[in-house]
Structure formats: C-alpha cells, structure tokens
Design a protein with these regions (language model features):
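Active-site-adjacent C-terminal substructures of enzyme catalytic domains
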Residues: 106-225
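Histidine/acidic-residue-rich, glycine-tolerant segments that coordinate divalent metal ions
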Residues: 3-133
C-alpha cells in the first residue's frame, strides 16, 4: 500500500516541478490492486498484492497524488466492488473493468453503478472462456462501456481488434500500447517486480518466462498501428 502512495507522490511532485510533466500527465490510472487472483485474469500482477477494494485506501491515493488519480481498473465480481465503484464514480473518477473473471450479470451491475470502460478488452481474462455468454461478449454488448485495446500485435489478433472496433464504434475505442520498461530491449531474459522472470522475444513479445501469459508490451503504437 505504501508503495502505491510513494509512486503517486513522485508523479504528483513531477507534475508540480516540471512544466513538461504538467503538460503530459492528465491523470493517473491505477490498474488494481482489486483484481481477480486467478491465473489468467490477473495477468502478470503479483498475486500477493491483490486485495479487496477500500475507499480508505482510495482516499490515501488521492491524498498522495493531490487528486491526480483519474481512473481505476477493478474486477467487478469481487466482494464489495459494486459499492466501491459506485462511490468513486460519484467522485469523478473513471471506473474501468479489467483483470476479471466477471459474469455477464457482474458486468451489467458494474455499468449500472457507473463503470465506463473496459481495460484491455479481450485480455486479462481466463485462458479459456465459454463460447457464450462470456465477459468479452457482455462488454462488447454493453453500450455504457467504452473499450481500450492493446494493439501491439500480440495481445489481440488483427481480426479480433477489427471486430471489436466495429462493435464499439471508433468513437468509443482507445488504442494503447501497454508498453513496459522492456520496450526496445534486446531479446533475452529479464527480472521485473511485475511478472518476475520475463522473456523478451525477437518480435518484442514480452511474457512471463515459461508461460503463455503476457507481461505488457515491447513496442509503441507508432511501431504497429
């Protein structure tokens, strides 16, 4: 918990100190820590840091960041998640759904409570989903949810991304790189606080070594879009 606050304070200090930072940082997106603990949905996030949502903790984030926390990604199926996201939505923070094993009902309840976005739609899910219904179909069909898509050439096949953009409409889609600190690094094995033992392949695929799970991206959108 202290680590998140210390990093938020560093961002806030940069915004106050450096003009370029002030112009470039519109807000902070906190992806977790209230996400699914299951392998697959949690992605590369360390299981030991996953915890239940807490308004008190959210308030400590905003205090450290001087109000810069603009978006939070949460798994809506967690105990207390709907009440939590309803409250932070009333405070002007964008609520996004992600790294989740949510049911169709969970997703609709979250939208009712004020959720506005699907984080990395099509990723941060179980490796195998029912044909239908499933969380992807439910989020595509939910008109109150916009979608962010990782278009690094690895997280989503081109055809899948095309269908998702057509379903949501270009005005409700945000393209992201999901680039991490290994972007542009030579192929090889690295160590990270997120994911642990990381492999960077020749095509800049960043994954947890020995698994199919991705651990961010090794490219920028300019490289692939």
């Amino acid at each position: 918990k202290a680590d998140i606050c210390s990093r938020l304070y560093a961002v806030q200090e940069a915004v106050e100190t450096f003009p370029y930072s002030r112009q470039m940082i519109a807000g902070v997106h906190i992806e977790g820590p209230s996400i699914s603990s299951k392998d697959g949905p949690r992605g590369a996030h360390p299981k030991e840091h996953i915890r239940s949502p807490s308004i008190k903790e959210f308030e400590s984030w905003q205090e450290a960041a001087c109000g810069l926390v603009a978006m939070i990604t949460i798994a809506p199926e967690l105990h207390g998640a709907i009440d939590y996201l309803r409250e932070i939505a009333t405070r002007g923070v964008i609520v996004a759904l992600g790294h989740s094993d949510a049911s169709e009902e969970d997703i609709h309840k979250a939208a009712d409570a004020g959720a506005q976005l699907s984080t990395h739609l099509g990723n941060g899910l179980a490796g195998t989903l029912p044909r239908h219904p499933n969380a992807v179909w439910a989020q595509l069909a939910e008109d109150r949810l916009s979608a962010s898509l990782i278009l690094d050439g690895h997280h989503l096949p081109k055809s899948t991304a095309q269908v998702m953009i057509r379903a949501k409409g270009i005005e409700r889609v945000i393209l992201v790189s999901d680039s991490v600190k290994f972007a542009g690094m030579e192929p090889g094995r690295y160590t990270s606080s997120i994911g642990g033992d990381i492999k960077v392949s020749c095509d800049q695929r960043v994954s947890i070594s020995g698994t199919q799970f991705l651990a961010g991206s090794g490219v920028s959108l300019l490289d692939v879009v």
